[in-house]
A protein has these predicted regions:
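Electrostatic, structured charged patches in enzyme active sites and in nucleic-acid/phosphate-binding
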Residues: 1-116
Length: 116
C-alpha cells in the first residue's frame, strides 16, 4: 500500500520545536504562550497492519504523560495506530484544533501560516 503524501505542508522549527504541519505549529505556539509544557514525542509503538508490523509515533506528550496526535483525517488506519498506544492519547481532529487555529488567526492575522 502506497503512503499518502501531502504537498505544500508547512514543516520546520519554531522556538526550537519541530512541527510537521501548520496545525502542529498552532498548537506549539498556543502552548508556549500559555505556559503549557508540550514535548515532541520520540518513542515509536508497534501496531499490526495487513499481517505485518508497522510503527507509530504520536506527535506530542503533555507534562501529565498524555500523548497528543494532531490528525487532519481520522480514518481506520489512524484509529488503528492510536489504539496501539498503551497510554492516554488525545486525537486532535479539526473539531479539537479549531480553537488553536482561531487563536492564531485572531492574534497573528489570517496569514499567520506565512508569517511563521
Amino acid at each position: 500500500m502506497k503512503k499518502k503524501t501531502y504537498q505544500n505542508v508547512k514543516r520546520g522549527y519554531w522556538n526550537g520545536k519541530w512541527y510537521d504541519s501548520s496545525w502542529e505549529l498552532a498548537l506549539i505556539v498556543y502552548c508556549h504562550e500559555h505556559g503549557i509544557e508540550l514535548t515532541r514525542n520520540t518513542k515509536k509503538y508497534p501496531y499490526k497492519w495487513y499481517n505485518h508490523i508497522e510503527y507509530y509515533q504520536p506527535d506530542f506528550i503533555l507534562e501529565d504523560g498524555t500523548f497528543l496526535e494532531v490528525k487532519g483525517i481520522n480514518d481506520y488506519r489512524a484509529k488503528r495506530k492510536v489504539s496501539s498506544i498503551p497510554f492516554p492519547i488525545k486525537v486532535m481532529t479539526y473539531k479539537e484544533m479549531k480553537p488553536y487555529l482561531e487563536y492564531m488567526t485572531l492574534k497573528y492575522g489570517k496569514d499567520w501560516r506565512d508569517r511563521f
